[in-house]
Amino acid sequence: MVDLNTCTYCGKFFTRERTLQVHVCEPKRRHLQRNEKFVQNGFMVFQRFYEIHQHTTKTKTYNEFTKSQYYNAFVKFGRYMMYINPLYPEKYIDYVILSKIKLDHWARDDLYEAYLIDTLKAEPVEAALQRSIATMMDWAQEQNVQWSDYFRLVNTPRAVQEIQQGKISPWVLLGCSAGKKMLNSFTDEQLQMTQRFINPEYWSNKFKSYPADHLFVQETAKEARIE
């Protein structure tokens, strides 16, 4: 029989019920945080980690997660995922799990950046175009202007940030004249900040290798009157 004044999480006994009520041990704290987004992210990655490395279909429980010695590291990464809002989250999770990089080092900008650059090169042109247009529309709604004027009117610091975040794909940026015209307005520093994300030499070869996709971008831009 469990004593009524014993913490069900850590087993500690208290002489007064009120003391038990305000008591917060690490196991209880983890239980109370269960519905926090960053904890849910960490739990999801924890489950996927064991699916990949143990080749099992048996899903890890939240109780197993709270008792794991790696709980804090997974939660830290879950918080980092909230911060960066990664492109294709499930692919990103698999990328870091299979990267052979230590768990404690997963929440690193350079690791995500490498993933993002690879993903921008590999994703279908339709997905890249859809995301870029959605980004332009968000900007247009904020500014109360036409989204097709993005490349002409957006302030360059914002454009730099959205290129670095992968929100504006090289498919669109380098695939239409308006995007290239905006790049010509960048300072040397801004060009340097975006260089590794857009890699003009790579994308020039990409357009030659996939002429139908390049034409699709150009025709979409023309139809939308992106200028």
Please identify what each model-predicted range represents:
Residues 22, 26, 44, 48-55, ...:
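Charged/polar, solvent-exposed surface patches and flexible loops
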Residues 1-43:
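C-terminal recognition-helix end and immediately following basic linker
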Residues 19, 32-34, 86-90, 148:
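Short, solvent-exposed secondary-structure capping/transition elements
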Residues 17, 43-46, 74, 78, ...:
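Intrinsically disordered, low-complexity regions
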Residues 59-140:
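Extended alpha-helical scaffolding regions
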Residues 32-76:
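Charged, amphipathic alpha-helical linkers/stalks
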Residues 147-227:
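Charge-dense, extended regions
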